Swiss-Prot record:
GO molecular function: haptoglobin binding; heme binding; hemoglobin alpha binding; metal ion binding; organic acid binding; oxygen binding; oxygen carrier activity; peroxidase activity
Positions of heme b binding: 64, 93
Alphabetical GO biological process terms: hydrogen peroxide catabolic process
Taxonomy of the source species: Eukaryota, Metazoa, Chordata, Craniata, Vertebrata
Disulfide-bonded cysteines: none
Subunit structure: Heterotetramer of two alpha chains and two beta chains.
Residues recorded as bearing S-nitrosocysteine in the entry: 94
Pfam families membership: Globin
InterPro entries: Globin, Globin-like_sf, Globin/Proto, Hemoglobin_b, Hemoglobin_oxygen_transport
Tissue-specific expression: Red blood cells.
Modification sites for Phosphoserine: 45
Protein name in UniProt: Hemoglobin subunit beta
Function recorded in the entry: Involved in oxygen transport from the lung to the various peripheral tissues.
Length: 147
């Protein structure tokens, strides 16, 4: 559960309505893989991830980034039940993929940076603070099965 004020929830929802999930998802996942290269080990089947340009132009990275942000969108629609919303993904990432749950926090922070880059002045400190709460809540929900 994420505790947002009415104003924070409105700001998150308003900005998210303008997000191009295809573009932002691929960019966020790509930046995660470039900035934190050890995360690439979970994506061996994605082909060439040898350089930043290769990562950022990789169609599998873009497609998976879109999928990730689709799940994030579902979370935004269920802020009062993030653990339930992400239960299956938490189980998958914990039991089958063995993803370090710290990676969820890293991806959330990268997503906030990408949103700031795309929205500039519209991504005010207040909007950033609200998104930091949301990505922290999503990361906690995804890490739930690890506990």
């Amino acid at each position: 559960m994420v505790h947002l004020t009415g104003e924070e929830k409105a700001a998150v929802t308003a900005l998210w309505g303008k997000v191009n999930v295809d573009e932002v998802g691929g960019e966020a996942l790509g930046r995660l893989l470039v900035v934190y290269p050890w995360t690439q080990r979970f994506f061996d089947s994605f082909g060439d991830l040898s350089t930043p340009d290769a990562v950022m132009s990789n169609p599998k990275v873009k497609a998976h980034g879109k999928k990730v942000l689709g799940a994030f969108s579902d979370g935004l629609a269920h802020l009062d039940n993030l653990k339930g919303t992400f239960a299956q993904l938490s189980e998958l990432h914990c039991d089958k993929l063995h993803v370090d749950p710290e990676n969820f926090r890293l991806l959330g922070n990268v997503l906030v940076c990408v949103l700031a880059h795309h929205f500039g002045k519209e991504f005010t400190p207040q909007v950033q603070a609200a998104y930091q709460k949301v990505v922290a809540g999503v990361a906690n929900a995804l890490a739930h099965k690890y506990h």
